[in-house]
């Protein structure tokens, strides 16, 4: 955290942590893209993606990408079920099993263009301050 003052409030600290997490995600996506790994879509599963619309919207705004969130309380178990049904021959592919068994997506978060320029200024400052060291 930078700029911390005695008057800094808990919501301001929470926002700073959420923003730093979103910036780190963007840094990872940028690094992958620069090295030839194209990420076609972002999908939120469990935890924060289901509990915090605020964080998910911030992530969409920072990355400039739409994020789909699935509505599944036991995503890991459902993933096992999907693969097991394909291996057992119930479905011909993972995609077919997903279409049949999963509720996808429950919500979508679309980037808000009006927020992007300000967030990109803050992202550049984050990188300049040494966010997500690259080694």
Regions found by a protein language model. Give the residues of each.
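Glycine/Thr-rich phosphate-binding loops that ligate phosphate moieties of nucleotide
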Residues: 1-135
């Amino acid at each position: 955290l930078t700029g911390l003052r005695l008057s800094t409030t808990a919501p301001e600290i929470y926002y700073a942590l959420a923003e730093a997490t979103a910036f780190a995600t963007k840094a990872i996506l940028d690094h992958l893209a620069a090295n030839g790994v194209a990420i076609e879509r972002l999908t939120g599963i469990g935890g924060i993606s289901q509990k915090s619309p605020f964080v998910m919207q911030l992530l969409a705004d920072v990355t400039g990408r739409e994020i789909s969130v699935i509505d599944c309380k036991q995503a890991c178990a459902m993933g096992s079920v999907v693969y097991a049904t394909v291996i057992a021959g119930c479905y011909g592919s993972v995609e077919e099993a997903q279409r049949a068994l999963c509720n996808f997506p429950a919500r979508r978060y679309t980037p808000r263009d009006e927020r992007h320029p300000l967030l990109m200024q803050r992202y550049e400052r984050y990188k300049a301050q040494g966010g997500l060291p690259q080694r």
